[in-house]
């Protein structure tokens, strides 16, 4: 089980933040999870490099720059600096942070494309697209708006309805218009270029006429499904494997890798006004970031890049969110293997982060930017808290601020830091801030921290190996449970020996207790280093140690004795609940100000007046949600069962998932349109409608009085 038994060469990446918005806690979660793993690998002596970059191409970046009156290059330069500042403020330590708009990325993208093309994995065909004659550009689906052809909701996107969850083609949208200028688009044909993903799945192999095939082409020994099932690349998560099996069973489709100009990105070789789709060159940004780093830092090792990207004895490890699983487990490995590179060794998939039991919400102040968090709270505290919640799966994580306060104040400040602070101030001052020697009793405690045998699964192992294994498996919650338990043991030793009494009665005995406590705390700081590096380094600084904490120092032969200890400086304060409240309130006010700015000149809607007779036809009743769950294939919908008293239980598909998680809805009383004609949807029958106000993350369900009963009619 010992993860450090052999030397490893590892290249690690986290997903690239997109360059049209600020860094928020979702980005920070992934950065911290990855950084902890990288720091651990380095701390046990492995060769490990951590790369990332800003994802800079695509229509949204081009339009954001146009809106600001600057060039895309100017926009991504500024945003890239902001992203790097915000991510590194949480102690995320990249070996290199780059931009996908780089010469290296363009060269590698071109190389991969031309190799895929030479091997017959590229095709082209004409497709119909919406085109804005005013803006002189083909419109992506998200830049077309209109009325949903299914439920007739207005102001819906060109590819799916956020109200009913229907998916459709932009040409099916009613009264469609360009979201930039408001004019109706026309349909034009355009040749697009496709990557033949099915070439890398044996199930999808099809016969091809002899006239169109070169026998040396369309041949690949790499089968995606076999790779997924046998390599262990995503083996730890049943949810991941289930989703991949669904995609394989449905068959892998050709992937459109081109976009028509105007477009901010790299032009496709040998094409006119055609650009690589952002998702082609974005993951190649991992390669370009590493290439730029290796060329600068290893000038005498020209094969350093190939030693990772073409050598399967090295490891390539990606950390990603579950929303980009398709790209990283299907397109990306196929592109690499089809162009003479190698597929990743591991793709670690994590869930999303919510705040106080709900999705991050701008209206509630819980859509928290990294910059705002750092303004009010200690980033090390978030690292500790997230680590305490992170396991090897892809479950979503909830940042409950009440739990955050309790866990940080109790387990970190009140336990692990407390053992240091309680012996490092007045007691050590009275001892001329000089350590003594470790007593026999103290040595037993230190050996317990370093070598004790602990049950693990069906067997047992040393505490060091268990912590190392848990780190390597990304089971950070297990790591912190073990370290906190050891911290309890150290504090119990301090309580039992009461050095604040000994300093008056037996100063040399007090010196022994302080020496044991600080040595034990130093070893805990090593264990903790990947999670809270700054706190661990502060403990090292206190002990006058110049090096960074390293797992090689987890050895009783490295006990510190008879050394001078520096004056104590505050290591970390407790979390202030008031700071959290101020932060959330500032977020709310900021969002409110934005809404006021954008609504200074609202377009008046035509109001439709109805008679009292019309209103009487609508039967509004109190309902109580008795069951709620997600809807497969519809990210915006929640399927709820609503108890309407004498009317029984009705099934409803509600477009509320942007603001409410299904697991938080059970038992909630709501207001329901109870006599709505049942509507057949592709997911099932929806028999009623929940009343709500607001849009997007500001959406709020109408909640009746607490004494209202299911079935009560509103009058």
From Swiss-Prot:
Cofactor annotation: Zn(2+)
Ranges in a coiled coil: none
The protein's Enzyme Commission number: 6.1.1.10
A Gene Ontology biological process term: methionyl-tRNA aminoacylation
PROSITE patterns xref list: AA_TRNA_LIGASE_I, TRBD
Cofactor binding notes: Binds 1 zinc ion per subunit.
Annotated transmembrane regions: none
InterPro entries in alphabetical order: aa-tRNA-synth_I_CS (IPR001412), Anticodon_Met (IPR041872), Met-tRNA-synth_bsu_C (IPR004495), Met-tRNA_ligase_1 (IPR023458), Met-tRNA_synth (IPR014758), Methionyl/Leucyl_tRNA_Synth (IPR015413), MetRS_core (IPR033911), MetRS_Zn (IPR029038)
Keyword set, alphabetical order: Aminoacyl-tRNA synthetase, ATP-binding, Cytoplasm, Ligase, Metal-binding, Nucleotide-binding, Protein biosynthesis, RNA-binding, tRNA-binding, Zinc
Function per UniProt: Is required not only for elongation of protein synthesis but also for the initiation of all mRNA translation through initiator tRNA(fMet) aminoacylation.
Family statement drawn from the similarity comment of this UniProt entry: Belongs to the class-I aminoacyl-tRNA synthetase family. MetG type 1 subfamily.
Full protein name: Methionine--tRNA ligase
């Amino acid at each position: 089980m010992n993860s450090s038994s052999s030397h490893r060469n590892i290249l690690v990446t986290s997903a690239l933040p997109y360059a049209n918005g600020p860094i928020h806690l979702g980005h920070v979660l992934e950065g911290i999870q990855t950084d902890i793993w990288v720091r651990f690998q380095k701390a046990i002596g492995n060769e490990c490099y951590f790369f990332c970059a800003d994802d800079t191409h695509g229509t949204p970046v081009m339009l954001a720059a146009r809106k600001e009156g600057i060039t895309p290059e100017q926009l991504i330069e500024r945003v890239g600096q902001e992203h790097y500042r915000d991510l590194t403020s949480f102690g995320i330590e990249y070996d290199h942070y780059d931009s996908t708009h780089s010469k290296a990325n363009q060269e590698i993208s071109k190389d991969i494309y031309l190799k895929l093309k030479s091997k017959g994995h590229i095709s082209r065909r004409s497709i119909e697209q919406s085109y804005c004659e005013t803006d002189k550009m083909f419109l992506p689906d998200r830049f077309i708006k209109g009325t949903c052809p299914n439920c007739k909701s207005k102001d819906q996107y060109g590819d799916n309805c956020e109200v009913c969850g229907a998916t459709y083609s932009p040409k099916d949208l009613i009264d469609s218009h360009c979201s930039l200028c408001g004019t109706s688009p026309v349909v034009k044909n355009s040749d697009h270029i496709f990557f033949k993903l099915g070439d890398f799945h044996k199930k999808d192999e099809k016969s091809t006429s002899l006239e169109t095939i070169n026998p040396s082409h369309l041949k690949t020994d790499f089968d995606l499904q076999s790779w997924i099932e046998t390599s262990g690349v995503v083996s730890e998560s049943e949810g991941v494997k289930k989703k991949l099996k669904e995609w394989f069973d449905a068959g892998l489709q050709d992937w459109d890798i081109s976009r028509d100009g105007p477009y901010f990105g790299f032009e496709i070789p040998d094409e006119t006004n055609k650009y690589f789709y952002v998702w082609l060159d974005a993951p190649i940004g991992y390669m370009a970031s590493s290439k730029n780093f290796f060329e600068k830092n290893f000038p005498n090792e020209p094969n350093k890049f190939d030693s990772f990207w073409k050598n399967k004895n090295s490891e390539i490890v990606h950390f990603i969110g579950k929303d980009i699983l398709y790209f990283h487990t299907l397109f990306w490995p196929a592109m690499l293997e089809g162009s003479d590179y190698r597929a990743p060794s591991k793709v670690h998939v994590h869930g999303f982060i919510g705040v106080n039991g709900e999705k991050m919400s701008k209206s509630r102040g819980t859509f928290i930017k990294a910059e705002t968090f750092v303004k009010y709270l200690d980033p090390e505290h978030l690292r500790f808290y997230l680590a305490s919640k992170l396991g090897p799966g892809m479950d979503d994580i909830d940042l409950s601020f009440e739990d955050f306060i309790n866990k940080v104040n109790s387990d970190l400040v009140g336990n692990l830091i407390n053992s240091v602070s309680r012996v490092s101030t007045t007691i050590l001052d009275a001892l001329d801030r000089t350590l003594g020697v470790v007593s026999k009793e103290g040595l037993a405690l230190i050996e317990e921290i370093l070598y004790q045998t602990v049950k693990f699964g069906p067997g047992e192992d040393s505490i060091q190996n268990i912590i190392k294994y848990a780190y390597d498996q990304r089971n950070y919650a297990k790591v912190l449970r073990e370290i906190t338990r050891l911290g309890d043991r150290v504090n119990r030793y301090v309580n039992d020996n009461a050095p604040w009494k000994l300093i008056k009665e037996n100063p040399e005995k007090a010196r022994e207790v302080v020496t044991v406590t600080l040595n034990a705390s130093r070893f805990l700081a090593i264990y903790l280093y990947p999670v809270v590096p700054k706190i661990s380094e502060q403990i090292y600084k206190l002990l006058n140690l110049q090096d960074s904490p390293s797992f090689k120092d987890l050895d009783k032969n490295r006990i510190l004795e008879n050394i001078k200890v520096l004056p104590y400086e505050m290591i970390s304060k407790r979390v202030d609940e008031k700071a959290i409240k101020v932060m959330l309130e500032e977020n709310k006010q900021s969002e409110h100000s934005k809404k006021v700015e954008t609504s200074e000149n609202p377009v008046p809607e035509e109001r439709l007046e109805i008679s009292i007779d019309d209103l009487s036809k609508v039967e509004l009743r109190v309902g109580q949600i008795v069951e709620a769950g997600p809807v497969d294939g519809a990210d915006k919908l929640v399927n709820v069962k609503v108890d309407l008293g004498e009317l029984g239980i009705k099934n409803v598909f509600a477009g509320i998932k942007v603001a409410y998680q299904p697991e938080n809805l059970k038992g909630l009383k709501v207001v329901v349109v109870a006599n709505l004609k049942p509507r057949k949807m592709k997911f099932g029958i929806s028999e009623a409608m929940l009343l709500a106000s607001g849009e997007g993350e500001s959406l709020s369900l109408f909640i009746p009085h607490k004494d209202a009963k299911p079935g009560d009619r509103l009058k």
